[in-house]
Amino acid sequence: MTRYFFDVVGHGRSELDYTGRILPTPERAYDAAELMAFDLAVKQEDATIGWAVNVSNVEGHKLFSIPVQESYLAAA
């Protein structure tokens, strides 16, 4: 199990995740980041389009970034 950190960044702002979540695989972290991006797009709509959920490991290395996109709104 590994701890992953989910930072929300965009438009010159950052909401840093200082706690993280312990997940079994990078794929599960990716899935969690996708859900976060979807949630941001649906709940905050235009305010967060263009933002991203950056996922990093405990050493601070960014593993991947999931953009908050309008296309998520079409799926809602």
Name each region found by the language model.
Residues 2-4, 19, 34, 49-51:
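A generic structural signal for short beta-strands and their flanking turns/coil linkers
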